[in-house]
Amino acid sequence: MDSEQINVNLDIGAKAVMLARRAAAAKLNNEKLPEVPDDPIFHEKHGVFTTINTYPDNQLRGCIGFPEPYYELGEGIIKSSIYAATDDPRFDPMEPDELNRVTFELSILTVPQEVTVNPEERPKAITVGKDGIIAVYNGASGLLLPQVATEYRMSAEEFLEALCEKAGLWQGCWKYKKVKISKFQAIVFGEIEPNGKVEQR
């Protein structure tokens, strides 16, 4: 499945980002979790990631999700948003008063497909800015969303090296045939400012 095959317009994207924000807010304030919108897309299974960034300096505050379509989209958004706000091991759990100083971003993923070319050819099989990548080897794994390469202006090779580091593997791990590399695409929506207008990225 290509990203163009995920039928998500800006209206749905805005609802998805709002659901993520409301879910995190409900968890942090010990309130009832929000209802999932009725739109059919929220009841289809998709991989999804929630990214929370500080505002206005745009530093990562939490990012967790599910690369595989384990959950219906609405449920996946709620879970990933709560985990990003409270369980990202790189950060302390958010406090409720932080909600007005962060933005929420949602990435809705296609199903990952293994990159089956010769390992040395893997950079050529990855489209920077379009593909996200996953590495799996011997119980270790890591994932980088497509927008990471764009944000840090990485080449495909640099993107793969960053993936090896993210997965806790050795430098150049992507050249090793037994390291499984998969790629996926994502449709990304995010708030321009806290509680603000949502745009597609």
From Swiss-Prot:
PROSITE patterns: AMMECR1. Residues 11-200 form the AMMECR1 domain. Gene3D superfamilies: Hypothetical protein ph0010, domain 1, Hypothetical protein ph0010, domain 2. InterPro entries: AMMECR1 (IPR023473), AMMECR1_dom_sf (IPR036071), AMMECR1_domain (IPR002733), AMMECR1_N (IPR027485), AmmeMemoSam_A (IPR027623), Uncharacterised_MJ0810 (IPR023472). This is Protein TV1384. The lineage of its organism: Archaea, Methanobacteriati, Thermoplasmatota, Thermoplasmata, Thermoplasmatales.
